[in-house]
Amino acid sequence: SDAEQLKKLYFEYLTAFPPTEEQNMETWREMIREFYDNEFIKLLVCEVDGIVVSTVHVTVIKNLTLNLRPYAVIENVVTHGSYRCMGYASALLEEATLFAKSHNCYKVFLETGSNKESTLNFYRNNGFATGLKHSCLKKLP
C-alpha cells in the first residue's frame, strides 16, 4: 500500500534518524486518510509502475494578515535515489504550488535540511528563492 511505500521512502531517503520505536502501519494509514479528507492538506505522490518514487506534503494555513490570505508550507520532499533528476519531484512541487494558488495563498514556504548546492539549486530551479528570509528552528522532544 501507499503507507508502507511512503514509510520506506521516508526512512531510506529523508529521515536522518529513523524512529527507534516500531511504527504502527494502521496509524500511518489513518493519518493518510485524514490528510486526504482535509481540504487544507495534500499528500502528493508520484508512482512509477506501482511504486511510490516521490512525494511532497503541502499544508495551507489560514492567516490573519495580508488581507486574510493564507500561506502554504511544503514539507517532506523526497524522491527515491534511483528516480532522481527525472522531473518527478518538480512535477509534485508544481502541483503543490497549484494547490496553494487554489486556496489563494500569498506565498509557499519550504525549508530544507540540506546545505548541498545541488539541493538548493533544485529548489531555485523550481521557483523557490533562497536567502530572502531567515528560518529559526526549535526542535521539540
Residues of each region from the PLM?
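Conserved beta-strand in the GNAT
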Residues: 43-45, 51-60, 78
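Conserved acetyl-CoA-binding loop-helix of GNAT-fold acetyltransferases
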Residues: 76-79, 85-98, 124-125
